[in-house]
Amino acid sequence: MVKLRLKQYGGKQQATYRIVAIDARSRGXGRAIQEVGSYDPIKDQTQXNMPTIVYFIERGAQPTETVKDILQKAEIFAQLRAKS
């Protein structure tokens, strides 16, 4: 099963995250299938590759709770519903 989850980058007190599609059985710092976006909690900025996120979700990828919240803030799910 593929999951959309956060992968931490940056140093102490300056953490940034990449939203990645990754096999659910691999560890957190494991090799990602593909990077689909990024999230900076300090600046509260989200960047996402919408077509790639939709591609993975349509094929059964499950976002983690945190990623789901981030994508809802970025209104990705609203765009996904409008598409179908």
Swiss-Prot record:
GO molecular function: structural constituent of ribosome
GO BP annotations, alphabetical order: mitochondrial translation
Keywords of the record: Chloroplast, Plastid, Ribonucleoprotein, Ribosomal protein
Origin superkingdom: Eukaryota
Predominant location category: plastid
One GO CC term on file: mitochondrion
Localization: Plastid, Chloroplast
Pfam families according to UniProt: Ribosomal_S16 (PF00886)
SUPFAM superfamilies: Ribosomal protein S16
Family to which this protein belongs: Belongs to the bacterial ribosomal protein bS16 family.
Name listed for the protein in its UniProt record: Small ribosomal subunit protein bS16c
